[in-house]
């Protein structure tokens, strides 16, 4: 699929970062010069990023990261025919994925990683408890068959779910999964510190599974939400059918878009009664500016850019 012009790369690594300000500066300079967009999160505990650029600059980025001593990145690539990000953002935070649990040593405590090829066997065992670690809005559009939805609004709520629902299951086989694997790293490490004995996690996350396992053998049902302008992907990493409501930032289905409550860029069935008249008017004005920008060939962050815009 590398004949598609844009590479989308997601990666993370838990490692102690020194000179974090300098690392941010070097990455910002490199990505800006090479027209790479997306988000990089840096923290004392490591790096977490989803970026996109033309194929060659992303190859150069991988070499740059090695030069910066990120030798053991957990990374995943996919390819697209348009730029899925609007801008470059590099942030320094307390954690590379927010869990609000200080002093958690992920390298020491993370669960056993299970490859895509072995995942179906594990989750189809009667004694396995299968848990989706993602947030509720992500689970709603797709998940693994027979998985448990913890109904969390954010990742840090997962700890409460454990205490309320799995506190008596510390000796059971618990298999967990998330989009790319990073949330499972923290969740499984936390569970190990709480006495859970048999914690397994899907290596590379859902995205790796969707790429590795053919549709006819897949236990995945629905689509997988991704945090970029693709919105969702399906089995074998094919483009999904969901769009993003730019009013509430929730994924919306084809049926949602047929609803009387749906107006592109302004409202959907999930938010039509939650936004004010002023908010809706502002969204209408934004839509108008997008159309003007399209006609004049001007930059607008809500327009999907193609390789010709990067030449």
Regions found by a protein language model. Name each.
Residues 2-112, 135-174, 182-311:
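Rhodanese-like catalytic fold shared by cysteine-dependent sulfurtransferases
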Residues 110-115, 122-123:
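A conserved helix-loop-strand patch within extracytoplasmic ligand-binding domains
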Residues 130-132:
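Structural scaffold elements adjacent to functional motifs in cytosolic proteins
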């Amino acid at each position: 699929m590398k004949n598609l012009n844009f590479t989308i790369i997601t990666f993370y690594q838990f490692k102690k970062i020194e000179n974090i300000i300098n690392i941010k500066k070097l990455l910002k300079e490199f990505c800006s010069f090479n027209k790479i967009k997306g988000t990089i999160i840096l923290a004392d505990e490591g790096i977490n990023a989803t970026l996109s650029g033309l194929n060659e600059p992303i190859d150069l980025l991988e070499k740059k990261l090695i030069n910066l001593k990120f030798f053991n990145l957990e990374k995943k690539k996919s390819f697209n025919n348009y730029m899925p990000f609007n801008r470059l953002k590099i942030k320094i935070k307390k954690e590379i994925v927010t869990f609000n649990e200080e002093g958690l040593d992920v390298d020491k405590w993370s669960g056993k990683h299970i490859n895509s090829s072995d995942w179906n066997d594990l989750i189809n065992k009667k004694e396995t408890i299968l848990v989706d670690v993602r947030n509720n809005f992500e689970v709603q559009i797709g998940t693994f068959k027979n998985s448990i939805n913890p109904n969390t609004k954010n990742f840090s709520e997962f700890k409460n779910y454990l205490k309320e629902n799995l506190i008596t299951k510390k000796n059971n086989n618990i298999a967990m999964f998330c989009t790319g694997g990073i949330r499972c790293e923290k969740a499984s490490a936390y569970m190990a510190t709480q006495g859970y004995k048999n914690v397994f996690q899907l290596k590379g996350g859902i995205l790796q599974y969707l790429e590795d396992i053919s549709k006819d053998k897949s236990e995945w049902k629905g689509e997988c939400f991704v945090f970029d302008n693709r919105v969702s992907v399906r089995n074998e990493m094919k483009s999904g059918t969901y769009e993003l409501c730019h009013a509430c930032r929730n994924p919306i289905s084809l049926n949602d878009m047929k609803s009387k409550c749906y107006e592109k860029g302004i409202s959907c069935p999930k938010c039509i009664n939650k936004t004010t008249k002023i908010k809706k008017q502002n969204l209408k004005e934004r839509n108008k500016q997008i159309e003007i920008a399209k006609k004049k060939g001007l930059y607008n962050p809500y327009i999907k850019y193609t390789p010709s815009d990067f030449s």
